[in-house]
Amino acid sequence: MNVVPTSENGPPPVYREIAEELRERIRSGRYADGDRLPGENSLMERYGVARATARQALSVLINEGLAVAVRGSGVYARLFRPLRRHGARRLSKESWGSGRAIWQTDSDTRGYEVEGLVIEEVTPAEHVLRILELPEGATVLRRSRRYLVDGRPVQSAVSHLSPHLWEGREDSEAARRIRAHDSGPGGIYARLTELGHTPAHFTEEIRARMPTPEESVELELFPGTPVLEMARTALTGHHRPVEFNEIIMDGSAYVLQYDFDA
C-alpha cells in the first residue's frame, strides 16, 4: 500500500532543508554576524530549486531572527549572543547596594544603553494603583525607557513609584535623583533605601506571548518573535509595595537563569 507523505512520515520540505543547512552555518560561525548569505539565485543554482523555494528558505531564517533582509542589498546573518538574566542575583542588595546598576548583572562585558527615558507624574491604570495600594485617582511617578545592547533594542520598562515615598523630603538628594534622568549609583533601589524604604522582597511574574504592534515597533522585532512580559513588585521588609515595574523583553534576546538550593 502506498503511503502519502505527511509532515509526520515524509521528508521535510526542501526549503526547510536548505534553511537548516544555512542555520547550522550561521550558528557554527561559518557565517559571522553581518556576513551576506547566498541570495536566491545562488540557492537556486546550488540546490536546483525554484525561486519561490529559495525565497522560503531565506524567509525561515529571517522569521527566526537569524538573518535580516536589506532592501536592494541582500540577506545578512544576524547572530546576537543572548543576555543571561540572573533572576535572583540581579536584585540582591549586595548588587545594587554596592552602587551597581542591576542591568550590569545581565549585560556581561557588552554594556548597555538607555534610550528614550521619560519621567512624568501620571494617574496610572487601575491595576497599578491596586498593586501599590494607592487610592483611586492617586498619581505616581512613571519612568519609561528602552534598553539596547550592541545597538539592538532588547527590553522596554515602565516603573511606577508613589510620590508619598518622599513626601516632605522632596528637596533631598535621594528624592531629586529619583525624579532625574540619572538616578545615581545603585539606581532607584539605592535611593529608596536612602529614603528609608529599603526593598527587601521582590515578586516577579513572567509570561510569554506574542507582541502587540506597538511592541514590535519599539523593540524592532522580527515577525514571529515572542516577548516575555514581566511584572515586578518591590516591597519593604514590612511588605509595603514601593515600586511596580512592567517590563517587555525580546524573547529571542534572553536566557533566564535561576539559581537556588534544594
PLM regions with names:
Residues 50:
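Helix-turn-helix DNA-binding motif, specifically the short coil turn and the N-cap/start of the second
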Residues 29, 34-47:
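A short alpha-helical element within helix-turn-helix/winged-helix DNA-binding domains
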Residues 2-19, 45-46, 56-139, 167-190, ...:
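HTH-adjacent hinge/linker in prokaryotic transcriptional regulators
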